[in-house]
Amino acid sequence: MKLLDLNNPFGAPVYHEESVSSTMETARFLAGQNEGHGTVITADFQEAGRGRLKRSWATERGKNLLFTVLLRYGDISSIPEALTLRTGLAVSLAIEDLAPALAGSVQVKWPNDVMVCSRKAAGILTETDGKNVFIGVGVNVNQRDFPGEYRSKAISIVEAVPDGAAWSAGIANEGARFGLLEKILFRLYEEIEKPKEASAALSLRATDSWRERLIRRLYKKGETVTFIPGAADSDTAVEGTFSGIGPGGELLIIPRGENEEKAFVNGELRVY
């Protein structure tokens, strides 16, 4: 396990492995070794990488950014609300930091994806053991070819940036992944640590700002969508207008033929 020379605002180490079963599993191991809040493990390849609902994550070795952040909160009541969505916001902002030409084209799809030009560029998986939180992130950075069904649904940053557009320093090479990682960590720190500091100092509700900023880049907001509540294979569907997200990150839909919003905590937003 190699220690990377990256600036981590959490003040914790960033480790790198060429190949792991999954960065999520390695992060759990590191938690057991008493690594601190904000420790990161990144890898060139995951042999058993997975996303939400145990879906596989198709990636070429060394082309994309794969990492997990270990966050220690002591007890579950201290975990920031809507952490997956707030991570999505951080990732989307970092992508625009990296590739300014994509500003306005990067959106967050409820509950855990980041879309670039209406195609999936990143996925987020958040797990907890009650005390520790593990945020797994996968971002398509330099991959240009995706297998099978992913070909029309996925996109990488290098594919999305227009020819001739300016990149942030270090982009379009192997170091781009780690440059993006550093930017994501800074954005994530701003989303989940700085608001707590401001709230404690000013007695303000820090959650208002993240929600408002997220709503402005919410994928399919204001459009007619199909939502599958609960399990992804459920035969129950809700059609209606996607009106936004609630204070805790819940999905808000105005069902077809109704006038009032309904809130959903989990389920699948069908957009393909």
For each feature predicted by the language model, list its residue ranges.
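N-terminal lobe of the biotin/lipoate ligase/transferase fold
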Residues: 1-101
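Long, positively charged amphipathic alpha-helical accessory segments at protein N-termini or as interdomain linkers
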Residues: 9-10, 32, 74-105, 116-272
